[in-house]
Amino acid sequence: MTRKQKRLVVIAGGMSFILAAVLLVMFAFSQSVAYFYMPADLARTPVAPETRIRLGGLVGAGSVVRGAGSTVEFSVTDGSANAVKVKYTGILPDLFREGQGVVTEGMFAAGSNVFIADTVLAKHDETYMPKEVADRLKSQGLWQEGKGQEAKATP
């Protein structure tokens, strides 16, 4: 092999290694991303069962039903006619209550319209609302000035 051919093989090998590393990183990120939806979004574009998502909105009035143990069922609404039934097993945040902003993370079980949440995040205090929820409420004309202030960013 000439010097030129050896150099070409080394460059091709290095580029292949870099490409493989980039593809692995992209695959890892795609597996950990949970897209944000509101009930109206899910009514327009349903997600595949067992796809991990974040569901945000307001806890529906009169929808909280406590089951056996630490199981709780409630609905998440965005102020429209759309509501999504959520089932959560675990300890709810202290600030969780009807009519308050909430972001849940989980997935729809196969063959069910019930969202199985494994994480529930509630409002931080009287003046906080997750940025995603505030943006969606504003875009739908449901945001009321002076009723709360959105956070700068949500992790």
From Swiss-Prot:
Key words of the record: Cell inner membrane, Cell membrane, Cytochrome c-type biogenesis, Heme, Iron, Membrane, Metal-binding, Plasmid, Signal-anchor, Transmembrane, Transmembrane helix
Pfam families in the cross-refs: CcmE (PF03100)
Compartment list: Cell inner membrane
Identification of the protein by name: Cytochrome c-type biogenesis protein CcmE
Residues on Cytoplasmic side: 1-7
GO molecular function: heme binding; metal ion binding
Membrane topology: Single-pass type II membrane protein
Periplasmic side, ranges: 29-155
Name of the gene this protein is made from: ccmE1
Family to which the UniProt record says this protein belongs: Belongs to the CcmE/CycJ family.
An annotated GO BP: cytochrome complex assembly
Highest taxon listed in the record's lineage: Bacteria
Binding site for heme: H124, Y128
InterPro entries the record matches: CcmE, CcmE-like_sf, NA-bd_OB-fold
Main function: Heme chaperone required for the biogenesis of c-type cytochromes. Transiently binds heme delivered by CcmC and transfers the heme to apo-cytochromes in a process facilitated by CcmF and CcmH.
GO cellular component, one term: plasma membrane
NCBIfam families (alphabetical): PRK13254.1-1, PRK13254.1-5
Membrane spanning stretches: 8-28
